[in-house]
Amino acid sequence: MLLSKLVDLIKSGNSNFIKANIFENIDIQNAASLDVASKNQISFLEENNILKENLGRTAVSAIITFNNSEILGLLESKNISNIVVENPRIAFAEVLNYLYEQINFNPGIDDSVVMKESSKLGENCYLGPNVYIGENTVIGNNNKIFPGTTILGNVRLGDNNIIHPNCVIYENTRIENNCVINSNTVIGSEGFGFIPQDGKWIKMPQKGSVIIKSFVEIGTNCCVDRPSVGNTLIDEGTKIDNLVQIGHGVKIGKNCALAAQVGIAGGAVIGDGVILAGQVGVNNRVKVGNNVIASSKCGIHCDIEDGEVVSGFPAMKNKSWLRSSSIFKKLPELAKKLRQLDKK
């Protein structure tokens, strides 16, 4: 794609285009990171020091960057074409979509698909080999359901969803529109509900459901459990990484981001815009407010107010954790001084 054509596409995107300086209207064939980019490739830049480190060895043909006079001066000194936007990362994401077309799957049902007569399938859907669709399940329009996926009975799947290979969607699950469920993820499995009695465990039946609102994306090997009654909810726009466990009856708000190996125990309530970094654990029935940020390996055992940034185990305000961490490193030295004082 000619660089000028790419600029026109970026202008119509969401990155807030400012200007473009094209030294050669070269054919852009693909994209690469700045340190390995070669001719006919495009990259993006958000930090001055990265450019300075790589400017001498990169052969990149064009760079998407922000409006920084120092960066633009360095690029112009090397005759590197540049596209200036307010958000280079968003522009680069759009460029990747333009340059790398996704493989199209023509609508159709593979001969090996098992689909119960009581189920309903919308228009323009693709069902790959060995897909199973259970009783009374309703699937909307323009869905792609890839090989080996099992969708059990009474499921409602909206429009424009992508279900990748070998997923399992249990009965009574509701998934709205424009969602992506990646491979080997299980939606709606039984919650971990057992009642102790006389040294034994009595199983609590899990008869609730899972509701996933529109524009949710869930990574590979995730589990979203259903509760005994009511529902587990993942609200609109939330993004979930790989290997995440969401317990029964959990409520997750809009536009949250959950990184790998997050675990949320049953009944927890997560507000809107929450960011949980890798391996964060949330205790059962805890309430996490809106726009909370929890750093990696954080253990949230009590309610967190709106807008807090928390770290550590148990979770505390980030500033307090930084101070505590600094003191912790000095404990051997402090202990030595205490022993010396005791001797006196």
Curated annotation (Swiss-Prot):
It comes from the Bacteria. One of its GO terms (biological process) is lipid A biosynthetic process. It is an enzyme of class 2 (transferase). Transmembrane segments: none annotated. The keyword Acyltransferase applies. GO terms for molecular function: N-acyltransferase activity; structural constituent of carboxysome shell. It catalyses: a UDP-3-O-[(3R)-3-hydroxyacyl]-alpha-D-glucosamine + a (3R)-hydroxyacyl-[ACP] = a UDP-2-N,3-O-bis[(3R)-3-hydroxyacyl]-alpha-D-glucosamine + holo-[ACP] + H(+). Its EC number is 2.3.1.191. Pfam families: Hexapep, LpxD. Keywords: Acyltransferase, Lipid A biosynthesis, Lipid biosynthesis, Lipid metabolism, Repeat, Transferase. Pathway: Bacterial outer membrane biogenesis; LPS lipid A biosynthesis. SUPFAM superfamilies: Trimeric LpxA-like enzymes (SSF51161). GO terms for cellular component: carboxysome; membrane. The active site is at residue 248. Catalyzes the N-acylation of UDP-3-O-acylglucosamine using 3-hydroxyacyl-ACP as the acyl donor. Is involved in the biosynthesis of lipid A, a phosphorylated glycolipid that anchors the lipopolysaccharide to the outer membrane of the cell. Homotrimer. Belongs to the transferase hexapeptide repeat family. LpxD subfamily. HAMAP family: LpxD. This is UDP-3-O-acylglucosamine N-acyltransferase.
